[in-house]
Every structure is written in structure tokens, then in C-alpha cells.
């Protein structure tokens, strides 16, 4: 059996988030990852997904203030108009995912969606830059409801609260159909898989308790069993995307890999278990 090309790898020591004044050294080309989905983020750290609904555009996350010009450039490059962004869906409140919101809303007047849990954290950070994480000002207009999908054009997006990396991380599931082939693909974007804040000594950083770590493990293992055709990670390293881009950047079928979602989530669950060996005996002597 050939080696799996998509797998979790640790973040690079220096990526765009640590070098926001050096975009040329940390750029990633625009690529298509679903029939009507592209990563327009333009840098080697946080993904920004553009969904063409046929009735306007949806963005999942916005990246950094310093890279938002690449998002706008890539949207134009695809032949779309940034003014047609209707909804901005935020996986969580951390600055590397939300700091482009204000600029994009200024252009488009789009709705801004976030979980209620992370809006509370957003307000705490916006007042004091708590814990050293800068969050640029923006206004949330809508809150996710896991019982009510977000519908626009061809897309019906299911949301699921998946706390851990932040209290209000939200995961997205949606189907995307290729009209030329008739094939429909189930796609997923996890809301946040960084696990440093789930260490016993770091939980307070995100105002969380030990239960957050154990819920993260349970959620990852449960969601890993959901069939997903195309895994769209929120950071490129979570599926080693930037080292595995296709020669044809328009060939989204390159990313069809039914193992990628499952393996990524199991990897993160097992990593968190190691922080809590007294709870997970299989790691007691590791």
C-alpha cells in the first residue's frame, strides 16, 4: 500500500505567523480543494476557504491582517468580486483566524458568524489583549446554532461546537457537487486542533477546565468516524498540505482522501491523552 500523503505534521518553526513582514518567503499558491472551494489564504499557516455558493461567496476564516491583501487578490484572481462575500464563518476567535475580518467586512458588508462561547472570549481579548494574543477589532453579527444549518445557494453547512483549542471552536460539514461528473463530496473543516492549551498547566489560558481536554478527546474520536471525502484543515500542517500540493492547482480531486479526516482527528486525540496519563492508563509510562 502506498504511503498516505496527507498526515498531521508539527508546525514549521517559522511560518507566516512568526514572519508577517516576509510574505514572499511564506507564500502558498491559490489552490482548489473542492468543486466550488478554494484556499485563498495565500500564506503557509492559516487556511482561508472561499466557497462559491452560486448566490454569493462564503469565507471560512480570514487569516492575518498582514495577509488579507492576498485573500482579496486571490478572490479577484478566481474571477470573483470580494464585494460579493455574503458570510464570514469563523472557526474560533484567535487572531490568526479573525484579524482579516474588519478589512473584508469594509469591502463586502458581510455577515460575521462566531460561536457565542468564543464571542465571550473575543470580548475579553479585545479589551485587554489577554495572554499576549492580539485580536483586531471586529463585530459579530450572527451566532452558530448546531441545530440550524447555514444555507446559501448550493451549500448547506452543518456546524458543531468542538471546544478545546478555544472554548467556542466550531467545525463545519458540507457537501459539494461537481456538476460535470455528478459526484458529491462530503467536506469538513475542523474548528481548532492546536492542543497546547489542553495541557494541565495551560488550561487557564483559555479559561477552561480539565473537562475541556477530555471532551476534546471524545469529540475527536467520535467525529473521526464520520465519513469525510475531503479534509480541509484550518492550518496547512494539520494535513501536510503545503508539502503535498498537486501539480495542477485546479485539480481538487487530488485532495479526495477518505482517511485524512479520520487520521488527523485520531492523531490529535492521542496527543492530548499523553498530557493526562492518570486518566488514560495506556500512556502512564510514556
Model-derived features with residue positions:
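Structural recognition of the beta-strand scaffold that forms the well-ordered cores
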Residues: 39, 50, 58-60, 86-90, ...
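Active-site HxH/HxHxD metal-binding segment of metal-dependent hydrolases
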Residues: 66-67, 76-149, 256-258, 263-268
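Divalent metal-coordination and catalytic microenvironments
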Residues: 36, 51, 61, 71, ...
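Metallo-beta-lactamase
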Residues: 8-20, 25-27, 32-35, 64-66, 116-248, 252-255, ...
